[in-house]
Amino acid sequence: MTKKGKANGSFFGNFLYEQILSQRPHFLKDLAQVVDFRFVAEHCKDFYADWGRDPWDPVLMFKMVFLQFLYDLSDREMEEQAAFNLVYKWFLGLSTEELPPDHTVLCRFRQRLGPEGFETLFNQVVEQARNRGFITDRLHIIDSTHIIARVDLFRLKKKHKGKGDDGDDHYVDRHSPDPDARFGRKSKKKSFYGYKDHKVEDADSEFIVKVKTTPGNVPDGTQLPFLIDGRAGEATGDKAYDSEGNHAYLAAEGVTSGIIRRQRRPGRPRHSLRE
């Protein structure tokens, strides 16, 4: 029998949820009113063939991965939040007395789902939210975050040094358990080894409407055409996205460019005329 996400809690637990949720607005409360997550079960039905007789409800599991993505939580952090954060517990469908799946179960589910599976389900969530008017598309904000690969970074940095003044951002460690990761830049002086999550947020709802994961060495600006389309009224991002190609792309899509422009110093004339 599959454990259901919407558990029947005690009278006190249900009363507690009602009191908390009625006191103030919350993003997850609004999202739950416009998105029906039951479609997840059909997508994940084949995951449970060899999981034994009592697996966790796939809707609950996907919601945990979804919250991890929204709030940038590790598996252990997600387990803790699902156990003690009452808004999270309500969104997940747990009773106030019920404990969530532990971090090892969450990790296995996420691995089975995979990046492509998550993207497929995530896009369906976005479309439901858009169709219900939760997402306005008035202004899209593009940005990226760094994902650190779980590798022996000290050993990798020793190998990475000396490959040019700034190192080789295309360096591949063939013995790494995460061979698709690459060295990238947080700043001119700081590097990291891993991936980038390129995200687009709908400004009015503060909901992430598109995501793309790349190796850490991929420049932010190159990803704008894959993440912004003509549904956006305006798009903005930091100076990393300021290029003539990106401005031209947005214009062709009918999107107003609010990209922050780099400060360009007046160039010196190539030729000086002397009398």
Ranges and model annotations:
Residues 80-83, 101-256, 260-262:
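Polybasic low-complexity intrinsically disordered regions
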Residues 3-6, 158-163, 264-267, 271:
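Short Lys/Arg-rich cationic patches that frequently serve as NLS/NoLS or arginine-rich RNA/DNA-binding motifs
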Residues 28-32, 36, 83, 142, ...:
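Short amphipathic alpha-helical "interface-anchor" segments enriched in bulky aromatics
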Residues 48-50, 272-275:
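Short, solvent-exposed helix-loop connector elements
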Residues 1-35, 41:
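Charged, often Cys/His-bearing segments associated with DNA-binding zinc-finger transcription factors
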Residues 222, 245, 266-274:
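Short, charged, surface-exposed secondary-structure boundary motifs
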Residues 43-125, 129-134:
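Basic, low-complexity intrinsically disordered segments
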